[in-house]
Amino acid sequence: GLAYATGLGYSAPLAYSGLYGGYGYGYPGYAGYYGYGGLGYRSLGYSGLGYSGLGYYGGYHY
């Protein structure tokens, strides 16, 4: 489903997703999230809202 994460950017942009309970990483157009606890694992997903350095990510995840 749709996932969003916001946060400060890093050289390898990282952001924390409270909605999906996982850390995100990515570069323009892509973002990946790993869940934890009952939320499980979320693989790499396409992101149309990924902006490297801005730390803002959103996209569909498998």
Swiss-Prot record:
Q: What keywords are annotated for this sequence in UniProt?
A: Cuticle
Provide the GO MF annotations for this entry. structural constituent of cuticle
Role, per record: Component of the cuticle of migratory locust which contains more than 100 different structural proteins.
| Name of the protein | Cuticle protein 6.4
Lineage, top ranks: Eukaryota, Metazoa, Ecdysozoa, Arthropoda, Hexapoda
